[in-house]
Amino acid sequence: MKKYIIYIFVSFFIIPIHSQEDLWDVIRENSNFQYSADRSEIQKALKIYQNNQYLVDRLSKNGQRYLYHMFDVTLKRYKPVELALLPFVESQFDPYAQSPAGASGIWQFILSTAREQGLKRNWWYDGRRDIIASTTSALNYLDSMHRKTNDWMLAIASFNVGPARIQREVKKNKNQGKQTDFWSLKLPKETSKY
C-alpha cells in the first residue's frame, strides 16, 4: 500500500515539475526505430502534427501524468522507447477512452485481449483503465508479438489489427514472393496510419 501511495505522489506532484521537453529529448535520444522519413506516409503524419501545434500541445498535456511511467517501464524492460508513445495514438493518453468497438483504457484493449493478458474486470474495476496493469499487459503483448514476428513494426501492427491478420498477410506475401515488412503488407487503412 505504501508503494502505491508513493507512486501516486510521485506521479501527480513530482513528475509534472520536470520539464516535458526534457522527457521528449530523452525519448528522442533513446529512439530505436529505423524508418525512412522520405516515405509519403511519414511525411503526411509529420505535416499534420507540424500544422496542428494545438494537437501536439494537448496530447503532451494529456500524457504528462503517464508518459514518464511508460517510458521508464520500457527502458527497464529493454524495449524500444517508441512503445511508450503508443497511447498517444491509441487514446490520446486518456485512461477512460472508450472506442465504438469496445476497446477501453489508455492502451485501448478490447475485452478478449485484456482477458488473454490477465487484466481483471468486475463491476467496480477495469484493468484496462489501470495505468500500471495495462502498461505491463501492453508491453507483454507487444513483446510476445515481437517474438513471433521478429519485427517491432509488425508487433505494433498486431497490437492494432490482431496477430491473425498480420500472420495471414505475411504468409500471403511470402507465397507471392513479396517482402514481408510492415510497409509491404496490405493492411487496413487505420493500421497503416498507426
What is the meaning of each model-derived region?
Residues 124, 133-193:
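Contiguous mid-protein beta-loop-alpha structural module that forms a pocket-lining wall or clamp
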Residues 101-124, 135-142:
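Substrate-binding/active-site groove segments that recognize
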Residues 96-102, 168-172:
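Short, solvent-exposed loop/turn and secondary-structure capping segments
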Residues 3, 63-67, 103, 131-135, ...:
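Short alpha-helical patches at coil-to-helix transitions and adjacent helical residues
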Residues 91-94, 113-116, 162-165:
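Solvent-exposed loop/turn segments at secondary-structure junctions
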Residues 4-13:
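Sec-dependent N-terminal signal peptides
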Residues 1, 15-78, 83:
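An acidic, Gly/Ser/Thr/Pro-rich helix-cap/linker signature
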